[in-house]
Amino acid sequence: RICENPGIIQERLAEMICTDRTTAARAVQRLAENDFIERRFDSENQKIKHLYPTKKGLKVYEPIKRENDYSTEVAFQGFSAEERKNAEQLLDKMSVNIAQDWDYVKKGNKRNY
């Protein structure tokens, strides 16, 4: 997601991938250590670090993106344009539901099973 959203902050990245901040911090640390991303301080708030892909990161992103696009096309084989649109809308709706539930849990609440 960093290649798709250069300059994203770590907290927003954690929200996007529905993970806790600690897990996101560990992943970002490993990506930085392996020179896939770089962190740059915000010009107005030095506590905020923006994440950017490096050349190495962009190089590995391309085949990953192609694989993802290919897998999506395979998943939608045999779907009409309308069926695909409907499926994407349903998946978007499911994603919103999951994000709301995750936000609830992230705030320390417990789910009622």
PLM feature segments, named:
Residues 29-89:
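Charged, amphipathic alpha-helical coiled-coil/dimerization segments
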Residues 17, 28, 77-80, 103-106:
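Short, charged/polar low-complexity linear motifs in solvent-exposed/disordered segments
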Residues 22-23, 75, 108-113:
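Short alpha-helical linear motifs
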Residues 81-113:
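C-terminal regulatory/oligomerization modules of transcriptional regulators
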